[in-house]
Every structure is written in structure tokens, then in C-alpha cells.
Amino acid sequence: MILPSLSQGPFSLVIGSLCMKHPNLFGGSEKLDVSWDKGLYDSNFVIAYRRPRPEKLYQQCFLLKHSMIPEIGVHGFPIENFSRSVSGGVNLSRLSAGVELKEPSGRHWSNTTSIKLEHVGMYSDDGRCIRTDSDGIPLTCSGETYDNMVVLKQESRYAKANDRSLTRVNVQIEQGVPLLPKWLLFNRFKLRFTKGMKLGPTFYLSSVTCGSMVGDMGPYQAFAVGGLGSVRGYGDGAVGSGRSFLVANNELTVPLFSKAVEGAVFVDYGTDLGSGRLVPGNPGVRRRKPGSGFGYGYGVRFNLPLGQLKLDYCTNSFRHRTLYFSLGNISSS
């Protein structure tokens, strides 16, 4: 069945989604999910197979994924006072296969461990395999048109909410294991902390996201700072792209006419912590990204049955103004 997508991020311009599910594949309650998202410039294909296990044991999921997206966050070119980013002619193809183990959820904590084999390839806009960007700089760590890696990932989530406040923590640790020569060896860490509290009729929401990476690195693995889910008022990755980063978001919402319509004011700040020069090929430095920046503005939130419709009017450090339109889940805002 074709459904409209409510997601944000690489597939925010989704044309359609195809999803097929089988709840009892081999007669033993095995579940098979197949999904395909197609955007104007992006595609994402996922096959997930789950076997039934007792609730007190790890839940297993076997995954096969393929995605193709324009690599704008790192290799894109900022324009219009960094308020937009346009393609640099580099597209990222990511094919992975692996298994995911999810621990039985506690009262507030949940943990997921996964291992996957990943093949990352670089393509031009016309579909050709490429090794270098427009400046002749290698796009991969290996120097080939692709990188291979085995990735061990541990993700822990904490969530607690009531009528007056909410707290969310997300910790991700990835370890690259070089099983063969030229396979990547690295450690990548990312943390997001979100705190919200009710202040009279208003609600204040603050979040801090940070991360760092050591070891082998392809330029496409850099942390991209800037954009709708990062620092509003900037294009995707227009603030910077580095081995490390820090982003802080603050937003205050107040009911306008009812709980279904809210006004918001916000301030965002992001920085690559001076690590842009540590990314192979210096893509952020070559594209003259500032490395740090802030955005501020105001907006309106419409809480609809399908999700939350957001309209944001932002101004960045260069005083360029941008209007954002997005649709997402209320719980993820």
C-alpha cells in the first residue's frame, strides 16, 4: 500500500512508501517486513525478518538494507549566506546486512546491540562510480570507489515523562572491526540529552547533542552540523562537518488558541569544535564553512491526528532568513 511519509531527514521529500508485512511466514509466528521509501533524490529499501523468542530473552532481527542519498551534509556547497546547501555531485550508496539484538525493556531503559557488514559506494549524479570529488580529493578512506567495514553498534535509550516534565537520553557507540586489509578500524560515539519542563502555561524543551570519532575515517562519516534537525537557519551541513561536534537546541512553546495550536520561539547553536581540518580531504574547510553558528526564530505548531505540523521562520548568524515547513511525530519533536 502506498502511504505518505511523515518522516524528517533524508526522506523529507518522499514521493511514496511501499510496505509489505507477513505476520506468520513459516507458521511459527515469524515476521517479515519489507519497506521501500522513494524520494525525489533518495531511496531506502529494508528487509527485516524477526523470529519469536520469549519476552525475557533478546529479540532477534535479521536486516538487509540499501539506501542511496545525495551526500549534501559533507560534500554539498553552502549558498545564500549558508541558508541552503546544494549537491556537490556526490551520492552515497550504503548496502548492509546484519543482525540486531534488543534486550527486554526495563522501566525506562532499552538497549540494542547490532553487528553488520557494510559496503559504502560513491556515485556521481549520472550513476557512475567515482573515487574523487570535483577537486580531485578521494571520497573514501580506502581510496577506491567504495569502503567495506564490519560495524558493532551498541545503542542505549532512556525515556521518562509525566504531565510536568520529560527526560530522554540516547547513547550510540560504533566500533569498526577490520577483518580484512583496507577495512576500516574506528570508534564513533554520539550522545543526545533532552530535557523538557512545564513552566506555567508554557513548555520549555532543551537538548544537547554531541559526538566524536577516532580511527580510520571516510569523509562521508564526518558529523554534519546545520539543517532542520540540527541548527535551523542553515542548510544541511552548512555550519560545518568534523570529527567532533556539539549542537544545542532550546525551544519555548505556548498554547495560542487551544492545545492543538502552539506558538514557539527557539535558539539553536552548533559547532564542529575545530575538528573540520581533521576530516580527510578537509571538505568543510574547502567549502568555507564557518565551523560554528547560531540560528533563532519563531514558529507555529499544529498538533494534528497524523502528527505535528511545524512552520518555523529562522534567522542565521549571517542574518539570512529561512522559512521551514515540516511534518513529524509529536513524540519526536
Regions of interest found by a model, annotated:
Residues 1-161, 165-170, 204, 225-232, ...:
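Gram-negative/organellar outer-membrane beta-barrel architecture
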Residues 4-5, 15, 148-299:
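Extended beta-strand-rich architecture
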Residues 297, 305-306:
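Membrane-interface anchoring segments and C-terminal beta-barrel signals
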